[in-house]
Design a protein with these regions (language model features):
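Core of compact, soluble alpha-helical bundle domains
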Residues: 1-129
Length: 129
């Protein structure tokens, strides 16, 4: 078995501090993305929810989803996103921001694919319009 298969994605990403740095950049991109903010419900949420709180929950979730010791304590994806009526175009903009962030931090291709698979697994609960 390859070493990569024996090491969690969480560890291969560098643990909580590395994940938090990537999430910090990613959420900054998402919060100011004009495509996402053209949706009035998303824009309102971006002004109502603090970026720091959003970053905390996303970091917690990414750590948990990648095999880290953290436990996600936020609401479920459908519950937190259903009222936003996110479209396919907004999802694509979100994914582009995610890809740009991973490129900025030189996340290796194998780990990028694994992270995208995790993100993609949430699409059905997030894209509701």
């Amino acid at each position: 078995m390859a070493t990569q298969e024996l090491t969690s994605l969480y560890d291969r990403l560098g643990g909580v501090y590395s994940i938090a740095a990537v999430v910090d950049d990613f959420i900054d991109r998402v919060m100011k993305n004009p495509i996402l903010n053209a949706n009035p419900a998303v824009d309102e949420a971006h002004h109502r929810v603090s970026a720091a709180g959003f970053k905390y929950y996303v970091t917690e979730m990414v750590c948990w989803a990648t095999g880290g010791p953290q436990h996600y304590s936020g609401r479920g994806m459908r519950e937190s996103h259903d009222h936003l009526k996110i479209t396919e175009g907004e999802w694509a903009a979100f994914c582009e921001d995610f890809d740009d962030t991973m490129a900025k931090f030189n996340v290796p291709e194998a780990e990028r694919k694994e992270l995208f698979a995790i993100v993609e697994s949430t699409k059905g609960d997030i894209v509701t319009a």
